[in-house]
Amino acid sequence: GDVYKRQEESIEKMVWKLGDTQAEDHPEVVSFGQFGEKLEHLTNGQIQVEIYPNSALGNHREMLESVQMGNLEITKCMSTDLSFYVEESAIFGLPYIFTSLEHMDACLIGGLKDWFNNLLAEKDLVVIAWLDAGSRSVYNSKNAINKMEDMNGLLLRVPENDVFMSSMAAFGATGTPMPMGDIYSALQTGVIDGAENAAPVLYSMKHYEVAKYFSLTEHIRTPDVLIMSKSYLE
């Protein structure tokens, strides 16, 4: 018993940092707390997870770079954010490519996630979990969107991704990249007319305070992912 205890104590305890851009009350961030508790239990306390929401460790690109360099253990991002490394990931941002959550899950289980991880492996990255971030819809301070023409002329914040910008152009609006943490003040001061994201983001980031109109366009459903360094995990 004493030998086993000494061996257990000799194992170095690890703290895994998990970075996200969302607010601490976003459903995904809340679930990360549960993930950390489960991991700590399964490893008998050898691995603990510290969560850093609200872009405390940088934007998506910066946190992905930190994971690659070994300075951050886990980050959550949209699957499309990985187009910085694997250009094929841009397909996840195509409008209406997934008709429902069930359709998206069927595609992932049917081989899409394995294909994607094989591409990421070449960049020393691996997806450890696929997450449903909800479908993205448009919200703005100018007008309700009941038909395509209502999008004309709107300046909307989008993620730093060419597919998102092209999609907004196809809808008649203009997409402009902007960090998550800057959206509220940009809406408040009129720098942008609106943004597009899932309803939980509208709520957790309090964008509803400065964007009067929420339109259930559900134009994009892109899965979120938890990312680690493949070599570190192995």
Show which residues each predicted segment covers.
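N-terminal secretory/targeting leader peptides
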Residues: K5-H103, L112, N118-E234
